[in-house]
UniProtKB/Swiss-Prot annotation:
Coiled coil: none annotated. PANTHER family: 5'-METHYLTHIOADENOSINE/S-ADENOSYLHOMOCYSTEINE NUCLEOSIDASE, 5'-METHYLTHIOADENOSINE_S-ADENOSYLHOMOCYSTEINE NUCLEOSIDASE. Substrate binds at residues 78, 153, 174-175. The keyword Transmembrane does not apply. GO terms for biological process: L-methionine salvage from methylthioadenosine; L-methionine salvage from S-adenosylmethionine; nucleoside catabolic process. This is 5'-methylthioadenosine/S-adenosylhomocysteine nucleosidase. InterPro entries: MTA_SAH_Nsdase (IPR010049), Nucleoside_phosphorylase_d (IPR000845), Nucleoside_phosphorylase_sf (IPR035994). It comes from Bacillus cereus (strain G9842). Keywords: Amino-acid biosynthesis, Hydrolase, Methionine biosynthesis. Belongs to the PNP/UDP phosphorylase family. MtnN subfamily. The lineage of its organism: Bacteria, Bacillati, Bacillota, Bacilli, Bacillales. GO terms for molecular function: adenosylhomocysteine nucleosidase activity; methylthioadenosine nucleosidase activity.
Length: 231
């Protein structure tokens, strides 16, 4: 099976890249694509760059050029739910934009005109990730909503404003909704799997720098388990 894995930063893709066999890397429009073999699958690893525009552009190139059957978006995120700690892993059930507001025209908050309010992760991929959850003993793995915006959520006031909009939000980051929206339009199944590098609004910038590598390791190890289970 041909599986695409997307991470925004070098720290988020480096560990998985090192695990690929027969790896070949090429750069298209400034985006790094590495093809290789892992767990019996052909894997295309994309380093997309940070933010929604980079994520949307590179995911479009990925789907047009490499035509993966499924897409997994990995990397770090800021924890939003009160039950979460740094290092925990969140599996998306749904992804939304948290910085889109066209409510003046009767759209839901976060809804892009012409698009659904949120983008549902593929049920089979979520179920597979849930199965892998049961093998994790040292970290907490949960599933829930992830929201995306082009800002790092370190300001407690901004965090509080987002909480008012989304009651059951588990994590925030800067690429997933763009990846999900492109996959939705191309009808390619996707899931987002993110490990927490910080807790949104609580000295997030300090925590991010300190725990990014740990988050990358946790998310990568979990994705390898998913690939091993994927048939």
């Amino acid at each position: 099976m041909r599986i695409a894995v997307i991470g925004a930063m070098e720290e988020e893709v480096r560990i998985l890249r090192d695990k690929l066999e027969q790896a070949e890397t090429e750069t298209v429009a400034g985006c790094e694509f590495t093809k290789g073999l892992l767990a019996g699958h052909e894997v295309i690893l994309l380093k997309s760059g940070i933010g929604k525009v980079n994520a949307a552009m590179s995911t479009t190139i990925l789907l047009e050029k490499y035509k993966p059957e499924k897409v997994i978006n990995t990397g770090s995120a800021g924890g939003f739910h009160h039950s979460l700690n740094v290092g925990d892993v969140v599996i998306s059930t749904e992804v939304r934009h948290h910085d889109v507001d066209v409510t003046a025209f009767n759209y839901e908050y976060g809804q892009v005109p012409g698009m659904p309010p949120g983008f549902k992760a593929d049920e089979a991929l979520v179920a597979l990730a849930e199965k892998c959850m049961q093998t994790e003993e040292n970290i907490q793995v949960v599933k829930g909503m992830i929201a995306t915006g082009d800002s790092f959520m370190s300001d407690p006031n901004r965090v509080a404003a987002i909480r008012d909009k989304f009651e059951n939000l588990y994590a925030v980051e800067m690429e997933a909704a763009a990846v999900a929206q492109v996959c939705h339009q191309y009808e390619v199944p996707f899931v987002i799997i993110r490990a927490l590098s910080d807790i949104a609004g609580k000295e997030s910038n300090v925590s991010f720098d300190q725990f990014l590598d740990q988050a990358a390791l946790h998310s990568t190890n979990f994705i390898v388990k998913v690939l091993e289970e994927l048939k």
